[in-house]
């Protein structure tokens, strides 16, 4: 893909990984250095933290689908710019259409604002369900935020527990 300037600095396109029939999909912001190097989302420090949370909740990484808003690493881990997001949004829409998740967990502000709308803020929205077009969305902290502020880990786990409770209600 060469739809935006991120193609000039990336090593790999980091498309997405996981169960293509997953009931739960996680959407983050964009790849970091480790993800860019390995070509897979959430394999760096934030990914390890996410895997730990999965373990606590009894989720297997292979059971969910994990993607990002942008598929190439923004330089210096900056937030993706609007033109970069717009270049990738159709890829993300197609991923959602193919996977058909019942629940989408939005990891952080970039995912939240670009999927549900600019009027949403992560601090006010996290932990609260939003329904849109038949899909339930759970906004929560991005795992990288937990690395900067340990106190957010409790909220993150609580939000994922809400996801698991809702998933259990849906499958019963």
Each predicted region: which residue ranges?
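A polyanion-binding, active-site-adjacent surface
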Residues: 1-172
């Amino acid at each position: 893909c060469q739809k935006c300037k991120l193609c000039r600095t990336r090593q790999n396109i980091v498309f997405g990984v996981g169960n293509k029939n997953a009931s739960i999909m996680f959407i983050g912001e964009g790849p970091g250095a480790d993800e860019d190097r390995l070509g897979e989302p959430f394999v760096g420090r934030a990914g390890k933290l996410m895997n730990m949370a999965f373990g606590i909740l009894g989720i297997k990484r292979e059971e969910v689908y994990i993607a990002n808003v942008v598929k190439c690493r923004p330089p210096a881990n900056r937030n993706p710019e609007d033109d970069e997001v717009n270049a990738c949004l159709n890829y993300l829409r197609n991923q959602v259409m193919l996977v058909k998740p019942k629940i989408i967990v939005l990891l952080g502000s970039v995912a939240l604002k670009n999927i549900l709308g600019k009027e949403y803020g992560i601090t006010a929205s996290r932990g609260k369900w939003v329904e849109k077009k038949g899909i339930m969305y759970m906004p929560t902290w991005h795992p990288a935020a937990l690395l900067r502020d340990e106190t957010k880990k409790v909220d993150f786990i609580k939000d994922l527990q809400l996801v698991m409770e809702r998933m259990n209600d849906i499958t019963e």
